[in-house]
């Protein structure tokens, strides 16, 4: 499957073959859901915590004698039924991460890239290196396409490109080693460099 390769001036400078095993995979919303949930679970801090009866400060003395008071027996003022007492079965500090099969993760990436390609929201760029800082040039480039947000994925990017995109809220730069399903779906248009296409073919095939 041949698609056009463009430069930073939005000019067609050639063509590239996209492997249909990566860029023309059947749409699988169930796989996308699994991979996105896996990614977001790994990002969770898991710092939620409530105090158990061993964490609550206060006396450990029995509040009153066991019998002959006419009241229910109590062993501690730190028990959950008292104001300021412990929380039973509350959240604890933990990791929410879990493992997901590598084949499923790779399939999710293929489905996400194929989805963008089928919607004409996938562009191939020759290079993302610019030798100067000029936000206006990047702005002119993205204005040629009627998309809301852009994810630019490349092998690496220099300071010129980084600072040129820094002030654009709808443009995100990402190194190819960090290509992931969540960021692809979160942006309207995905821009890959020629090097990134070759990298993805080696990674996913």
Curated annotation (Swiss-Prot):
Disulfide bonds: none annotated. The keyword Isomerase does not apply. The keyword rRNA-binding applies. One of its GO terms (molecular function) is rRNA binding. It holds the Pfam family Ribosomal_L4. Keywords: Ribonucleoprotein, Ribosomal protein, RNA-binding, rRNA-binding. Signal peptide: none annotated. PANTHER family: 50S RIBOSOMAL PROTEIN L4, LARGE RIBOSOMAL SUBUNIT PROTEIN UL4M. One of the primary rRNA binding proteins, this protein initially binds near the 5'-end of the 23S rRNA. It is important during the early stages of 50S assembly. It makes multiple contacts with different domains of the 23S rRNA in the assembled 50S subunit and ribosome. Part of the 50S ribosomal subunit. This is Large ribosomal subunit protein uL4. It comes from Ehrlichia ruminantium (strain Gardel). The lineage of its organism: Bacteria, Pseudomonadati, Pseudomonadota, Alphaproteobacteria, Rickettsiales.
């Amino acid at each position: 499957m041949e698609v056009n390769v463009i430069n930073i001036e939005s000019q067609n400078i050639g063509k590239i073959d996209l492997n249909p095993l990566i860029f023309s995979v059947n749409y699988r919303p169930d796989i996308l859901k699994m991979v996105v949930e896996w990614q977001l679970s790994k990002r969770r801090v898991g710092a939620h915590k409530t105090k158990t009866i061993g964490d609550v400060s206060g006396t450990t003395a029995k509040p009153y004698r066991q019998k002959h008071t006419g009241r229910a027996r109590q062993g501690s003022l730190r028990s959950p039924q008292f104001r300021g007492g412990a929380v039973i079965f509350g959240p604890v500090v933990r990791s929410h991460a879990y493992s997901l099969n590598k084949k499923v993760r790779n399939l999710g990436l293929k489905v996400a890239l194929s989805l963008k390609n089928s919607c004409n929201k996938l562009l191939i760029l020759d290079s993302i290196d610019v030798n100067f800082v000029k936000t206006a040039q990047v702005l002119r480039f993205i204005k040629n396409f009627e998309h809301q947000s852009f994810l630019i994925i490349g092998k690496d990017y220099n300071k010129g490109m980084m600072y040129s995109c820094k002030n654009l809220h709808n443009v995100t730069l990402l190194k190819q080693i960090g290509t992931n399903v969540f960021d692809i779906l979160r942006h309207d248009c995905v821009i890959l460099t020629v090097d990134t296409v070759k990298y993805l073919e080696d990674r996913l095939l």
